[in-house]
């Protein structure tokens, strides 16, 4: 079981059934989903499918996914995770999504800092982010966090300091 990761303003914790409404608010928002690899959700059924997929991928070791919870209101404001692990487990991709209502307030920077620190405990030494070329906000965030453009993707070596 993966641990909860606690920061100053956010907690990363396992996604659960109680999060369905907050997740639909995130994944059903066209602005939030503009550059996401998944289509914008149109029904709560799609959230249930997402949650089932998260459980299945975690059970097979293919992915680790957390809900990003704002501590102040105990609301799920996003998700982040690690996936596409290399054979040796030393590299993987990082993915994240934040409710547009919480953009540009430092929540994702804090969440990713917690995630990257945890990744080092798993033996991960290289993270990759696959970011759409038009997603200037995400590019700026990942560059701020030390990622460098590399073959149309962004990479960062760990540890994260």
Predicted regions and their residues:
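Short, P/G- and charge-enriched loop/turn segments at secondary-structure junctions
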Residues: 1, 53-55
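Acyl-donor (CoA/ACP) binding surface of acyl/acetyltransferases
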Residues: 1-34, 65-161
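Conserved GNAT-fold acetyl-CoA-binding loop/helix
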Residues: 31-53, 64
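Short loop/turn motifs at secondary-structure junctions and domain boundaries
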Residues: 56-61
């Amino acid at each position: 079981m993966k641990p909860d990761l606690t920061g100053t303003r956010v907690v990363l914790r396992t996604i659960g059934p109680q999060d369905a409404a907050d997740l639909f608010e995130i994944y059903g928002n066209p602005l939030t989903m503009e550059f996401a690899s998944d289509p914008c959700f149109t029904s709560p059924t799609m959230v249930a499918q997402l949650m089932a997929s998260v459980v299945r991928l975690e059970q097979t070791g293919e992915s680790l996914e957390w809900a990003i919870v704002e501590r102040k209101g105990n609301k799920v404001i996003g998700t982040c995770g690690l996936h596409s692990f290399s054979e040796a487990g030393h590299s993987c991709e990082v993915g994240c999504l934040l409710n547009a209502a919480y953009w540009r307030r430092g929540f994702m920077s804090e969440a990713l800092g917690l995630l990257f620190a945890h990744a080092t405990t798993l033996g991960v030494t290289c993270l990759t982010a696959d970011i759409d070329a038009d997603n200037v906000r995400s590019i700026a965030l990942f560059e701020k966090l030390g990622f460098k453009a590399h073959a149309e993707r962004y990479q960062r070596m760990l540890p994260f300091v």
